[in-house]
Amino acid sequence: MSSAPRRPASGADSFRTPEPESLGPGTPGFPEQEEDELHRTLGVERFEEILQEAGSRGGEEPGRSYGEEDFEYHRQSSHHIHHPLSTHLPPDARRRKTPQGPGRKPRRRPGASPTGATPTIEEGEEDEEEANEAEGARAPTEPSPASTPSSVQFFLQEDEGAERKAERTSPSPPTLLPHQEAAPWATEGAQTGVPVEEVAVVASGTAGGDNGGASGRPLTKAQPGHRSYNLQERRRIGSMTGAEQALLPRVPTDESEAQTLATADLDLMKSHRFEDVPGVRRHLVRKNAKGSAQSSREGREPGPTPRSRPRAPHKPHEVFVELNELLLDKNQEPQWRETARWIKFEEDVEEETERWGKPHVASLSFRSLLELRRTLAHGAVLLDLDQQTLPGVAHQVVEQMVISDQIKAEDRANVLRALLLKHSHPSDEKDFSFPRNISAGSLGSLLGHHHGQGAESDPHVTEPLIGGIPETRLDVERERDVPPSAPPAGITRSKSKHELKLLEKIPENAEATVVLVGCVEFLSRPTMAFVRLREAVELDAVLEVPVPVRFLFLLLGPSSANMDYHEIGRSISTLMSDKQFHEAAYLADEREDLLTAINAFLDCSVVLPPSEVQGEELLRSVAHFQRQMLKKREEQGRLLPPGLGLEPKSAQDKALLQMVEAAGAAEDDPLRRTGRPFGGLIRDVRRRYPHYLSDFRDALDPQCVAAVIFIYFAALSPAITFGGLLGEKTQDLIGVSELIMSTALQGVIFCLLGAQPLLVIGFSGPLLVFEEAFFTFCSSNQLEYLVGRVWIGFWLVLLALLMVALEGSFLVRFVSRFTQEIFAFLISLIFIYETFYKLIKIFQEHPLHGCSVSNSSETDSSENATWAGAGSTLGPANRSSAGQAGQGRPRGQPNTALLSLVLMAGTFFIAFFLRKFKNSRFFPGRIRRVIGDFGVPIAILIMVLVDYSIEDTYTQKLSVPSGFSVTAPDKRGWVINPLGEKSPFPVWMMVASLLPAILVFILIFMETQITTLIISKKERMLQKGSGFHLDLLLIVAMGGICALFGLPWLAAATVRSVTHANALTVMSKAVAPGDKPKIQEVKEQRVTGLLVALLVGLSIVIGDLLRQIPLAVLFGIFLYMGVTSLNGIQFYERLHLLLMPPKHHPDVTYVKKVRTLRMHLFTALQLLCLALLWAVMSTAASLAFPFILILTVPLRMVVLTRIFTEREMKCLDANEAEPVFDEREGVDEYNEMPMPV
C-alpha cells in the first residue's frame, strides 16, 4: 500500500466532517442510520479521541521537541519509511479485500456510481495474492462482525477500481506493533494545523501481518506545538526506491499551467485533488506523468515487503572500473568521455595521442578523499536498486536527488538529460564496424529509420535529450516491455580486436563500476549518488567492453564549487578497485558501512609530504612502509567476525582447524616418513600411478607440441656439449654417441615409470667433474676405467635400495642454501676455468707466430708431410675429416688459435645476449621468447656456418661416429665385461668401488632431489604430486645398469627440468595490466618427455652434421653455462658487496636485517669452504670432492648456528627463490635455483 501526507487547506479545520450528501433512491448503499453512524465514527472528533486515548497510554513526554538524535535513530532504523494511517492500526482492524460472502452486499465498481455522484478516478491496485495471504494470516484472530454489531471499525486502503469503505467489526483499540512507530506527520496536521510538504511515501502494507493480534506500543499523542519538517526524514534505501513502488511527487497540473498560477492556487488544487479526509467520499486522482518519470509494472504498486522483496545475494566479484567525465566533443556537444580505467591498476588516456598510458599505482590527493567521504555522507545512496536499463536507473537517481533535497525539482529534466548523454571511448575511432555508442535519442531515430514506424514505435525518449526544452515525457513502462538483454532489431555488432584483447585481461565473472563526474552550470551546488544495483546488468553503449554493471557513482556540480570533480572520480574509482573496499561495498547495508570502509582505506594509505623528490631512490622507504601497512591490513582482516571472515574465533575451532591443516599438510608431504620399509616408495606409487592414463590424455594440447620442439633443442645442446667434452676427458671412451644413447634410453624408461615426468634427466657438470677425476685415478693406477664404472654401478643400485628402504629422501631438507650455493659456485668456476684452459691449450698447440716454424705432428713423419702440404689448402672435405677419431691432430696451424677464440667468444656472446633479448623490450613477447629459448642452438648454428665459410683455416671438430656405433670402436664395444676387458680386474677394487659409488650417489642424490623440490613448489600448483623415493630409485638403478653398456650416469638436470615445467605451464590470460601473471594450470603428462627422449636418440643419425661442429663452439657453450649459473646465487652477490661501500648496498633482506660485518663474515666462511673444495679438486684426491661437499651440511647445522643468531641465519640462508614466469629484464630460470647446470 502507498499513501502520502496530505496538505490541508485550513489547518485542523480541514479534518471537520462535511455534511453528508443524500444518496439517491436507487443507490445500493448503507441505510441512512448506518450511514450516519459511519460518519460520526469516522469524524475527526472520534479520530482524536482514539489518538488521545492511545497517547495517554503511550507515556510520551508532553511537549517534546524532536532533534537530530531522533532523526538519526529514525533514519538508521527500519522506521524511517513513512507508513500510511492504515499501517498503524492493529492487524485485526486492517481489513483486506475478501471474496464476497453470502451475507455481504456487493461492492460498487467505479462504473456503477450513483446518479448525481461524481465517478472516482483510478489511483492504484493492490496485490491480490498478498491481500489473500494477509487475510488468511489474520483470519483466526479477527472476531466475527455479527458478534459486535454495535461497534464500528474503519480501515484505509487503495485499490484500483475500488472505493474506500467501512464495515462493522468488533471493537479493537488502535495500537502499534512493537516494530512500528507513529510517523510524525500522522498527527501533526490534525494537532497543529501546520501544512506538511507533499512527499512520495512508500509504505509496507503487510508490515505486521505475521504477528497477528499481538499487543504492542500504543499510539503516541503529539501535543500542540510547531515542529519544522526535515527533508532528511524522506531518505530511504535503494531497495525501496525501485520502479515498482516509486511514487513520485504529485503535481496537480502540468508544468506549463503551474507556472501561470500563484502558490495559493496550487495549494488549493493540491488540497482538492490529493487530500484524504476521513469519512468523506472523494475522488481518487490518477497521477499525471507529464513532468515526472512515472514507472509502473502491470499497474501494481506493492510495498517493499520482505516477502515480495527478498534480499539480493551480495557475493563479491572482481571489478572493472571505468571513469567517464562530462566533456565537449569536437562539435562542442557534451558527452561522457572515458578518461581512465581500473582493472587492478590505473590506466589513463593520454590527451594528445588518445591512447592508453602505462598502468600505474593511483596516487590520490588527501583532500579528494575527504571530499569523497563528505559527499557520500550527505549524498544519495541507493542500495539494491532493481533496474535493468540506464534510463530506469537515471529516473530513480534523479528522483532520489529531489527527495534528498540535493537538486531542485525544476532541475530534474536537465540532470536526466545529462545522465543519458552519449558515451565515447578511445577505442571507438579504431573500430571500423558499426558505431557502438548510441544515445537514447539517436537510438530512437535509428529504429524509426530502419523500421519505418511512427512516433509511437520510438523508444523511451520522445524529445531530444540535449536541448533546453524543459518538458520531457519519459515512459518507462514501454521500456520494460522490451527485454533488457535483447539487442534492438537490426543492430548487430561484432566485438573488435581491442575489446577482445581487453576482455582477456578482465577476470571472469567480473562486474563493472561506472563513475560519472562532470561540471554543469545549471546546478547551484554539487549533487552525488552512489548506486548498487540489485543484479548486475549490461548497460548498452556505456562501457568500453560488454561487462555487466553493478555499481554507479554520479557527481555533478557547478564549476564555482570548490571541488575537483576529476580527482574525486579517481578517488572513488581507486577505492572500488581496492579489494577490501569493493567487498565492503558489496556487503554494505547502509551508508555508514561505506563510510567505515573509506576510513579503513585511509588507515592503510600513505601520505607523502609536499617536498621535491630528487630521485627514485628517495622513495624506497615508501614501498617498505606500504608493505608494512598492507601486512597490518591483512592481519586485521583475519580478525573479522565469523560471519564476514573465514577465521574461527573460539579456541576449539582454532585448535580443530590447526589439526586439520596439520593432517592435510602431513598427508600431502611426500617426504614424510612412514616408519615402514619402502613405505615412502609405496606412497609414491599410490599417489602418482592412479593418474597414469590422464598423463597421456592431458598431452592432447597444442602447447605440448611446442614444448617438445623447445625441450628437444634444450636437451640436445648439453648432450652434444658434454659429450664432446667428456670424449676429451676420457680419450673417447665415452663420447657423444654414448651420451646421446644414454639420454634416450634412460629418458624413455623414466618418462614411462617415473613419478614426476616433468623432470628432464641428463648429464651435468658435477658428473663431468667426477668422470674426469675417476678416469685420472684409473689411469694413474693402471685400472680399466669402464670396468671400474661397472662395479660402481653395482654398488649404486645397492645404495639406492638401502636409501629408499630407510626412506632417506627426507635428508634433502638438510641441504640448505649454504651448501647448494657452494656447490653451484664450484661447478661454475670449473666450467669457466676449463674453457680458458682449453683455449690456452689451443694457443700453445697453434701459436700465433708459428708460420715460420716447421709443422710437427703427433703422428709419424709421413703424416707430418701430409699435414704440412695441406696446411694452407685445407678444403672442406679435409676439414670435415680433420677431427675424426684415430687421426692425429696437427700442430702449428696458422690462424687456428685466433679462429678458435672468435668461435668461442662468438658462441658465448650470441647465446648470452639472446638470453637477455628474451626479456627485453624489442618485438612482441612471443617472438622474443622463441628467440631467447632457442638461443643456444642459434648460437651453435651461426658459428658453425662461420667456421664452414672459412675454408683455409683448420679447427678441431667434434668426434662423432657414423651410424649406431660407439665413439671409439677400436677401444671398446657396447657391452663391458665386469671381470675385465684386457686384463682381470682386481678383486680388491671390486670392493673398493663402494667408496666412489658413495660419492657418485651423493651427487645424483643432491641434484635429483633438489631439482624435484624446486619443481614441486606450491607456487607451481602441481596437482598430481611427486615421488622422491621412486624417482631416485629409477635414476640410480638405470645408471647402474647402463654402466654395463659403458653409458654415462645421468641425474635430473635442474635448468632443463625447470624449463620443461615452464614450457608446460598455462598462464591465465585474465591478467590486469601491470600485474604479475598467475598460473592457470600445468600440463602434467608423460608424452613430451617421451618424445624428447626419442628425438634425442634419433639425433645419432645426423652424425655428418654433428661432425661439422668445432670444439671451440662447445667451449663457448661451456663458458655460457658457467656464467649463467652464477645468476641467482646469493653468495656471488654478497661477494660483490665486499667491494661496495654500504650506502650502495641493495635493498634486500640479508642487507637490511643483518649487520654488514656479520654478513661479510658469513660470506668469508662460504669462501673458505669453496677454497677448500678447489684445493681438493686440484690434488690427486679430487675424486673425494663430493665427500668434502657433503661435510658442509653438518658445518652449517653445528658450527654456524653457534656463530650466528637464528634471525641472522634465516636472513642469510633462507630459500627465497620463487618461480619466474613474468618477463622481467635480466631474470629467467637461472635466477630460480642455486644449482649447477
From Swiss-Prot:
Main location: membrane
GO cellular component annotations of the record: apical plasma membrane; basolateral plasma membrane
Coiled coil segments of this chain: none
Superkingdom of the organism of origin: Eukaryota
Record PTM Phosphothreonine, positions in chain: T253
Region (Disordered): 1-237, 281-316, 445-464
Membrane side Extracellular: residue ranges: 844-896
KW Cell membrane (keyword) present: yes
Biased composition (Gly residues): 206-215
Mode of membrane association: Multi-pass membrane protein
Example GO BP: regulation of bone resorption
Transmembrane segments: 704-727, 733-770, 790-812, 822-843, 897-914, 930-950, 984-1006, 1032-1053, 1087-1132, 1159-1195
Tissue: Expressed in the ileum (at protein level).
Catalytic activity: hydrogencarbonate(in) + chloride(out) = hydrogencarbonate(out) + chloride(in)
Gene3D superfamilies in UniProt: Helical hairpin bin, Mannitol-specific EII, Chain A
GO molecular function: chloride:bicarbonate antiporter activity
Low complexity bias spans: 137-151
Keywords for the protein's UniProt record, in alphabetical order: Anion exchange, Antiport, Cell membrane, Glycoprotein, Ion transport, Lipoprotein, Membrane, Methylation, Palmitate, Phosphoprotein, Transmembrane, Transmembrane helix, Transport
One Pfam entry name: HCO3_cotransp
Location of this chain's protein in the cell: Cell membrane; Apical cell membrane; Basolateral cell membrane
Modified residue annotations for Phosphoserine: S113, S144, S170, S172, S239, S439
Sugar-modified residues: N855, N864, N878
Feature: compositional bias, Basic and acidic residues: 37-49, 58-75
Family named by the database record: Belongs to the anion exchanger (TC 2.A.31) family.
Name this polypeptide is given: Anion exchange protein 2
Lineage: Eukaryota, Metazoa, Chordata, Craniata, Vertebrata
